[in-house]
Amino acid sequence: MTYALSEDEFDSPQSQDINNKVFWDKLHDIFKVTLEMVKETAEEMGIDLDSIDHEEAAKQQEQVHKTAKEQPYCQAALSYIKKVDSWFGSNKGLLKDKADELQTLAEADIPGTRPADEAVSIQDCLEVVRWYQHQIYVKLCRAASGLIRGELEDLKYLPQDANGSAKVAIIGIERSIAAWGGLLNQFPQQEHPILDLLVNLKRLLRQVEAVFPDARAFVRLGFDTAVTNI
């Protein structure tokens, strides 16, 4: 069977307009041809598409996700989320007092003080912490899922996908460490709880690097041109 999938399918102005019925008719025709192509290819490979157990596949996927979430580094990332929420919940007054202090300094216009810059620095650190708080966990769960599925299904691309997700998590962890360091400079009275968070992040970083030793070297298309020094 010959398949004519080319620009000729969309050679008229009407067929290139996504709001035009002609466009969708052409796309539907290509969809049918593509399905037939897949069917023939599967037959040549001895694969019975009708024999695929979708319920079993869904169960396996659910088990993969469950196993991924149970990985020590995923559990550590989940624990970090809770610790961050606890810190913010316990320090609403501290943050408000600091804001009032900086506002007073700004109004006093005392030479040698830079309350506006200090406020921006604190806000930046807080935003970084919040931005990566959940992302680290999500990316590590995806990385774990890719690693597990790659081993189960012997698919080489999945470990690479896992490395990509792990790299994003590593970036998030290290930027979070830097942000907490900035907050520690601003709130020295919070030394104990912030150091506890930093220790947890550093331990998590070591776990991730041990499980995904190639993650740092992974090149993300559109983001990395070489090994990223974070």
Question: What residue spans do the PLM features occupy?
Answer:
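Intrinsically disordered, low-complexity linkers and terminal tails enriched in Pro/Gly
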Residues: 7-19, 47-62
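Generic alpha-helical secondary structure signal
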Residues: 21, 25, 36, 192-195, ...
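Hydrophobic, aromatic-lined core segments that form the binding pocket/scaffold
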Residues: 51-230
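N-terminal cysteine/histidine-rich coordination modules
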Residues: 1-33
